[in-house]
Amino acid sequence: MGIWQRLLLFGGVSLRAGGGATAPLGGSRAMVCGRQLSGAGSETLKQRRTQIMSRGLPKQKPIEGVKQVIVVASGKGGVGKSTTAVNLALALAANDSSKAIGLLDVDVYGPSVPKMMNLKGNPELSQSNLMRPLLNYGIACMSMGFLVEESEPVVWRGLMVMSAIEKLLRQVDWGQLDYLVVDMPPGTGDVQLSVSQNIPITGAVIVSTPQDIALMDAHKGAEMFRRVHVPVLGLVQNMSVFQCPKCKHKTHIFGADGARKLAQTLGLEVLGDIPLHLNIREASDTGQPIVFSQPESDEAKAYLRIAVEVVRRLPSPSE
C-alpha cells in the first residue's frame, strides 16, 4: 500500500519538508500543527462536527468474523498496557491452540504492536478493498504503525483520528476470530469512547501499577467503561514486585497490593500480578514477547494464568 493510498484511506496528514502538515477537510486543504484553520476549512470542520452530533450515539455493530472483543486499557501511560495486551493475545493462543486470535492496536499516536510483535510493512488489500492483518507468532495484527513510517509522527486533529479508528474497526479483513484483543491508548478520551460506542465489547481488562498515582487513573478508566456499559473483567497489577537476580530479595518498588485495594473498592477482582523483570522488557524490545520466547518462565506463566482468568469471566459466544 503506497503513501497516497494510505492518506486517501485515512484522510490523514502528509508532513512537508518545512515542518507543516496538510490535511484534506471536505475537499479543502487546511494547515495544522499549531496553525489556525483557514476560514473555509474552519467552516467545513464546524459543519462536519454538527453532522456528527446530530446523529446521536452510534449504533453498535459487531466486527465481521469476530466472536469476542477484549480491550486492554489503562488510565495512564507507562504502566505496561501494551506489553500486557501483546502477551495476553499470545497467552490466549497458547492456552487453546484451537482458538484464532487477533490483536488490534488503536493507539494512533503511539502504536507499540509492530515493535513488540516484530512486524514491519504495509497491509495488503483484499479484492473487497479491506486491509489484511499482518501475521506473526500465530496472531493476526493490525496497527496504525503499519500505515506510517516508524519515525513519522501522526499529527492529526480529533476528527481525523476518529476517521482512522473507524477504518481500523471496519476496513480490516480479520477472517474468523475467536478473540480480538484491542490495545487501547492510555486515558479516557475520544478513542476509548468511539471504540466502546461503535462495537460490542465483551470485556475490559484494566492494567495498573500498584502506586497511588497510577491507581487514581485506573479508577477513572474502570468507571468510564461502566458508564458506557462495558463489563470490566478485572485488574492486572503490573510491576507488582522486583526480585533481585543475585540475592533474590523482593522489593515492592511501586508499593504493595494497591491494585487489590482498588479492586475491592470497585467490586472487582485482580486477574493476576506481573513482576517487574528485566526479561519482560528485553523480550518486548526485541520483538519476541516473553510468552512466546520464554514460555516456561515464571513471567510467562503469570500471563498464561491471567489469560485463563480472562476467559473464565467471558460469557459464552452464543449468549
Curated annotation (Swiss-Prot):
InterPro entries registered for this protein in UniProt: Mrp-like_CS, Mrp/NBP35_ATP-bd, NUBPL-like, P-loop_NTPase, YlxH/NBP35
Keyword Nucleotide-binding: yes
Gene3D superfamilies, per the entry: P-loop containing nucleotide triphosphate hydrolases
Keywords associated with the record: 4Fe-4S, ATP-binding, Disease variant, Iron, Iron-sulfur, Metal-binding, Mitochondrion, Nucleotide-binding, Primary mitochondrial disease, Transit peptide
Tissue and organ distribution: Highest expression in liver and kidney. expressed at significant levels in small intestine and brain (at protein level).
Residues noted as binding ATP in the record, renumbered to the chain: 75-82
Cofactor dependence: [4Fe-4S] cluster
Keyword Nucleotide-binding applies: yes
Free-text remark on how the cofactor is bound: Binds 1 [4Fe-4S] cluster.
Highest taxon listed in the record's lineage: Eukaryota
Subcellular location(s) per record: Mitochondrion
Phenotypic consequence of residue 56 to R: Found in a patient with mitochondrial complex I deficiency; uncertain significance; found in association with a nucleotide transition causing exon skipping; does not affect protein stability, processing and import in the mitochondrion; can restore complex I activity when overexpressed in patient fibroblasts
GO molecular function: 4 iron, 4 sulfur cluster binding; ATP binding; ATP-dependent FeS chaperone activity; metal ion binding
One cellular component term from this protein's GO annotations in UniProt: mitochondrial matrix
Range of the transit peptide: 1-38
Residues spanning the membrane: none
GO biological process, one term: mitochondrial respiratory chain complex I assembly
PROSITE patterns: MRP (PS01215)
Function statement: Iron-sulfur cluster transfer protein involved in the assembly of the mitochondrial membrane respiratory chain NADH dehydrogenase (Complex I). May deliver one or more Fe-S clusters to complex I subunits.
Family matches, as PANTHER family: IRON-SULFUR PROTEIN NUBPL
Assigned protein family: Belongs to the Mrp/NBP35 ATP-binding proteins family.
Illness association: Mitochondrial complex I deficiency, nuclear type 21: A form of mitochondrial complex I deficiency, the most common biochemical signature of mitochondrial disorders, a group of highly heterogeneous conditions characterized by defective oxidative phosphorylation, which collectively affects 1 in 5-10000 live births. Clinical disorders have variable severity, ranging from lethal neonatal disease to adult-onset neurodegenerative disorders.
Name assigned to this protein: Iron-sulfur cluster transfer protein NUBPL
Species of provenance: Homo sapiens (Human)
Gene this chain is encoded by: NUBPL
